[in-house]
Amino acid sequence: MDDTLNQANPSMSRRQLLNFFTGAIVATTASAAIYPATKFFMPPAESTDAEGGILAQDKIGHPIPASQILAQASGTRALIAGLAGEPTYLTVREDGTLDPMGIVNNCTHLGCTFPWNPVDQQFQCPCHGSRYDAQGSVERGPANRPLKLVQVQVKDDYIWISPWQETDPRTGEKPWWV
């Protein structure tokens, strides 16, 4: 008499089952290690609105509430991270609102960043001495083009920065950066 059980076709042997579970554990562990490494090398997605604008951020990437800048005195120029992280000046107007025209803080001569001089009421590039007026028009070279502009909008205490597409109000022409 035969005491063995007749198994016609077992669907999976014990060894195959253990190999499957081992492979699943290795794949899960590898995925868990690769995901953060991939996220590290990918730039963070910027919050955008319907017009292609992004939220104004501070230098470490936190959104800046409009109330924080509007609490400053009129004429104050706040430096924020704008489109593509470009440093951008926002101006508080006399009526307590933000100027809808932001000025990108990159000299059109060689791309240096520069401070606003409140005494002279000018942007002064320290690299080669270019001077720009309060609206970003060239007052003294070697730069020969006005500073790049961006559109500024406040919606629900958030500041949205979007590319300037209209005619440059300083020159009356199509912007050179479009």
UniProtKB/Swiss-Prot annotation:
Any one biological process term the GO annotation gives: photosynthesis
Gene symbol of the encoding locus: petC2
Similarity comment: family membership: Belongs to the Rieske iron-sulfur protein family.
Cellular component GO terms, alphabetical: plasma membrane-derived thylakoid membrane
Disulphide bridges: C112-C127
Reactions the enzyme catalyzes: 2 oxidized [plastocyanin] + a plastoquinol + 2 H(+)(in) = 2 reduced [plastocyanin] + a plastoquinone + 4 H(+)(out)
Listed CDD domains: Rieske_cytochrome_b6f
Keywords: 2Fe-2S, Disulfide bond, Electron transport, Iron, Iron-sulfur, Membrane, Metal-binding, Thylakoid, Translocase, Transmembrane, Transmembrane helix, Transport
Pfam family, one: Rieske
Role according to the record: Component of the cytochrome b6-f complex, which mediates electron transfer between photosystem II (PSII) and photosystem I (PSI), cyclic electron flow around PSI, and state transitions.
Originating species: Nostoc sp. (strain PCC 7120 / SAG 25.82 / UTEX 2576)
Note: The Rieske iron-sulfur protein is a high potential 2Fe-2S protein.
Protein topology in the membrane: Single-pass membrane protein
Cofactor note: Binds 1 [2Fe-2S] cluster per subunit.
Domain named Rieske: residues: 61-161
Subcellular location: Cellular thylakoid membrane
Transmembrane segments: 17-36
Cofactors named for this entry: [2Fe-2S] cluster
Residue numbers binding [2Fe-2S] cluster: C107, H109, C125, H128
Primary location group: membrane
Assigned EC number: 7.1.1.6
PANTHER family the UniProt entry points to: CYTOCHROME B-C1 COMPLEX SUBUNIT RIESKE, MITOCHONDRIAL (PTHR10134)
Molecular function (Gene Ontology), one example: plastoquinol--plastocyanin reductase activity
First-level EC class: translocase
Subunit structure: The 4 large subunits of the cytochrome b6-f complex are cytochrome b6, subunit IV (17 kDa polypeptide, PetD), cytochrome f and the Rieske protein, while the 4 small subunits are PetG, PetL, PetM and PetN. The complex functions as a dimer.
Protein name as catalogued: Cytochrome b6-f complex iron-sulfur subunit 2
